[in-house]
Amino acid sequence: MYRVGLAALLLGLGALPLSAQTIDLSRYEMVDLTHALNARTVFWPTSEGGFELQRLAYGPTPGGYFYAANAFAMPEHGGTHLDAPIHFAEGGVTADRIPLDRLVLPAVVIDVSAQAAKDPDYRLTADDVQTFERGHGRIPAGAAVLLRTGWDERWPDRKAYLGDDTPRDASRLHFPSFGPDVARLLVEERRVGALGVDVASIDYGQSKDFMVHRIAGAHGVPGFENLTGLGALPPTGSLLLALPIKIEGGSGGPLRAVALVPRR
């Protein structure tokens, strides 16, 4: 398995030398790739419920100090979130057991927003990957391949984002994503560490067999879905930190995704 520490990753990006074991983060722009969770958060159409925030306390206390606290509830798979390998792979790794080098890893961004604008069912192809590699070099093992479709600009309009807003019906969805053939190329040949996308699924909207999920899950590759802001990242050279809530036995969960982009 591809394993490398955070310091080594930053060294590869040119962030070091280290001084007294510190990292000069001023050399990086931090880009938030996460949608905020709220009542308008988009969930898969067949999900039970959405995001709920219950205020437990807000205001002055008898002791004279201010205090605020909330409780929240939500399905695992909504908003910017993790798909753990077990989501579509029996016996696969659960959310709490994903190795950190699958969550903190170099990012490669492939932009298909032009193609997706013409075809909402567009799927990344092997030709797209080969074109990318001719311009930017071979996708390295252990990298996160992030697919930019531009669909995040439609958030949180459910009909525009998912292609349909019929309650409890996932059969009419239309949005771009990865395709099975390119998933095999990336997972089996390039040996990438993760797949991410700025739409609701690493499978395209009209998928009926969720083959990309199945291929990724079988190889222990997590998925990061409903990302945003990928247009602010260069094709190569940034570092992705995609850290989910550590739910024991979870098939996924809310994700805070951030990229460190070297300042020019």
List each model region and its residues.
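N-terminal secretory signal peptides that target proteins for export/translocation
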Residues: M1-Y2
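Bacterial N-terminal signal peptides
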Residues: G5-P17
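Active-/binding-site microenvironments in catalytic and ligand-binding cores
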Residues: A20-R264
